[in-house]
């Protein structure tokens, strides 16, 4: 199993996004994925998942969730 990487952010740190769609937005680190080097920032990088209905009486839906971003795309504030 690969060893986790040392990252420059910790859970609870306030960070600013420096690249991507959410550039210049700020948020708090809520989770760290050390094996991939990605972090989850509260209120940043929302993605949508479309779910088809399973039966005719069922209704499809669109779920919104926060996706992780690479730690190199943020800086501490």
UniProtKB/Swiss-Prot annotation:
Belongs to the universal ribosomal protein uL24 family. Its main location: plastid. It holds the Pfam family ribosomal_L24. The gene is rpl24. InterPro entries: KOW, Rib_uL2_dom2, Ribosomal_uL24, Ribosomal_uL24_CS, Ribosomal_uL24_KOW, Translation_prot_SH3-like_sf. One of its GO terms (cellular component) is ribonucleoprotein complex. The keyword RNA-binding applies. One of its GO terms (biological process) is translation. One of two assembly initiator proteins, it binds directly to the 5'-end of the 23S rRNA, where it nucleates assembly of the 50S subunit. Keywords: Chloroplast, Plastid, Ribonucleoprotein, Ribosomal protein, RNA-binding, rRNA-binding. Part of the 50S ribosomal subunit. It comes from Thalassiosira pseudonana. It is found in: Plastid, Chloroplast. Transmembrane segments: none annotated. CDD domains: KOW_RPL26. One of its GO terms (molecular function) is structural constituent of ribosome. HAMAP family: Ribosomal_uL24_B (MF_01326_B). This is Large ribosomal subunit protein uL24c.
